[in-house]
Amino acid sequence: MRFAIAAAFGLLAGGCSKGDNAPPVATVSFSASKARVPLGAPIDLTYKFNVAPNAAISGDYRVFVHVVDDNGNPIAWNDDHDPKPPTSQWKPGQTIEYTRTVFVPVTPYVGDATVEVGLYKGNDRLTLMGPDGSDKTATARAYKVGTIHLLPPSESIFLIKKSGWHPAEFGADNPGTEWQWSQKTAVLAFKNPRRDITFYLEFDARTDVFSDHPQQVTVYSGSQIVESFAADNGGAVLKRIPVTAAQLGDAEQAELRIEVDRTFVPSKQPAGGKDVRELGLRVYHAYVEAR
């Protein structure tokens, strides 16, 4: 199920008093792959910009995407990002469209959440003409473009990290970023939905450690190989792995096993250190979705 609401972008010509009078430089559409999504689940967000015939944007602006609750209070979730291509390369009449997959953070709030979009560079924001008439005089230039209904995490298939996982870690400069390192073999267990599923695995690999050739990753359901790939990405990458109901088997509990052909111990690397753990992949998200 998809929804889309269009808005128009205007170039910021100066301070905003009772309204923004700058001409729109583009029309933006926002859509989500799901109108209702559990906390912790992945969702595809699509942004489409139809650049106006006489538009001119000076420099590179970032897109901010903030989510607020039904009282207008911010939820600890945003999708701020650099558009591709950057705004300095946008041409009059051009259509810019791209999709980003994000995982909804687990927050205390459930219910309707409003998505607000803007375009900014430092303290400068471009004017938007959104679908909500009241936004025409919004001095914050954050424009309401859609609504997503957030469901409790219990609506998702609950995953148990059964074995082969190190404790969770957090980014020192970004506490919202969490990961767990796997060992050579890591097992996830969950109640068998007896349906086809998609297994989402977001991870990165130490390509600097395995510079001769990348680690080989194999995902099993029982004794069956459901996916095999090279971990040749230095940054985070998301794999969507289809698994059939037949591959999950008939048992009440299903398991997915992630194996790497090689591991490393940080303390044995040239940089040294005190970390003596056996590390495989750094996993940011693991999620099972019934199809």
Predicted regions and their residues:
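C-terminal luminal/periplasmic domains and tails of membrane-associated envelope-modifying transferases
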Residues: 16-291
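Sec-dependent bacterial lipoprotein signal peptides
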Residues: 1-14
